[in-house]
Amino acid sequence: MAGIRPRYLVFILSILMMISGIALAWGAQNNLGTVQATEITLTTSGGVPISGILQRPLAATPATPLPGVVVIHGVIQSKEWVMAFGIELARRGFVVLTIDAVGHGNSGPSVGSNTDQGGIAALDYLNGLAYVSTLGMVGHSMGAGIAIQTLNETSTPVDSLVLVGGGSSNMATWANASVPRNIFVVVGLYDELFDVPELLNSLATPFNTTTPVIPGQLYGNFATGTARMVILPPTNHLFETIDPTCISATTEWLMTSLKGTPDAYWIPSTLLLYPMWVAGGLISCLGAVLSTLALFTILIQFKPFRRIQHSPNSRYFAKTPLYLAMGLLYGVLGLLALFAMLLVNLPFTYPQSLGLPVVLGLFLGGLVAFLLLICIKFFLQRKEDPPSWNDLGGFNGLKNGGIKSLIMTLSIGFLLGLIGIIWLYLWVIPVDLYLALDFRVFLPFLKALSPLRALFVPLYFFLLLPVTLIDGLWIMGYLRTKPQEKWWYTQTWWTSKAIFIKVLIMAFILFIQTVMSFIIGGPFISGFMGFYLLFLWIFIPMYAVSTTYLAWSYRLSNRFYIAVFFNAFLFSWLMAAILPIYL
């Protein structure tokens, strides 16, 4: 009994972590009860459903209307990615509608030549609310472009426009010194998609000046609606939506342009609550990971799961020079294959933008890595005691009942992996339905799926399954390090070393990009290559999580099949959730 008590204790503690993280995030999104967040569905003129979160301060009534703001996210994102704007604006007396653009999040897919990407429908909805007075718009990246398109196609008056990391490089083609009203441009100093000197030059005409625009200087005035300003906070494209300077400056601008002066609801812009929302997501996601690890540990004690429970094999381990050299090679191969597929124009289309290039890149990298592993095995056969497939966490031959044993092991691994995914989804759905909250806030992990998006999961699963299997053979097979004296120290050592070697190349690239950008005062690698590097910020935490599952699966069963199936489901869920859909 004493042997299983820690498993249940960790399981209970992880559930408490999830509950506390959800409570923190909900408290921030609802400003501790003074704001009501509601999930709503709109419809564009083309009949596409738009998913949104409406945050209404309880003080907003027909008798005391408050300004309304539409907030729109960037590409390969969803409304949660810009929720920090909604949180800080709503608690300061703004009615905020944050939407999933067409083809993104839980909104309907982009079909044909749809002109309304959700902005017009959202603006019309807010304009029709009796407790909303004036209107403003905030758009990040692609969302900035949608906001501009919306203003060009609607007659609804908008008194303030905030463009974050997008829409401003060609402003002279759609704006002048007075139209649109009160424009605020926010571009990260290290934004990979902008050349700052070129941007400041291009803003001269709409800012009504003949010289390059000076960051932080107010041009025009709010009384006539001609106010313009640009700021360059020290951040990159991806993190503009959670950068404190971006958030604070945006709230200040909208307060001045839509309210005129601070009112009874105003809170100093430096007093930010959204970090509590981010912390809640981190805590709940960490609890989710721990809960599945504990769940696997509990379930494997029972029939029929315990048939695959075995102590880990310690006969083979990779020495440090081999671990580093081959680990780096494995990481480089994977990255080269991924970026090669991203940069190549495929001769056919796929409904989820970038889905096929990413999956094929991962598959190609896995295939090359597997062929390399076979070559290494063949070379090592000449040595005295080469590692067997069994030593690497694979299977011990197909003779003498080997096929039956392999099928049984794979079946149980699949079932446990599926149970783990179902367990997580059973947490995600009620949080989304009853709290109007995304379980993982803005993190690229554990997002509720629309029925259409759910259809993509099995398609990705079968393509990613060989990738996660090969990853197991490398990370917890060929590159598995020497065990230590105590099991918990060994597990910690295995997990940390596995994560280190898995993300080393990606972390190094991001480190160089960050440091060099800081040194030169702008993005070191810019353009689309710089944009694609932002994907590494998604892959690193996901690989850290998947590698943790690999190490624990090996601990439980001397195999990594539980994690192979679970990780294939997990990455399929991730891709189905975040990639745009264009039909």
Language model features with spans:
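Alpha-helical transmembrane segments
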Residues: 16-20, 286-293, 469, 543
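Cytosolic-side membrane-insertion boundary helix
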Residues: 262-292, 300-324
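An N-terminal hydrophobic leader/cap segment in hydrolases
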Residues: 2-43, 51-53
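Alpha-helical transmembrane segments of multi-pass membrane proteins
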Residues: 21-25, 293-297, 334-341
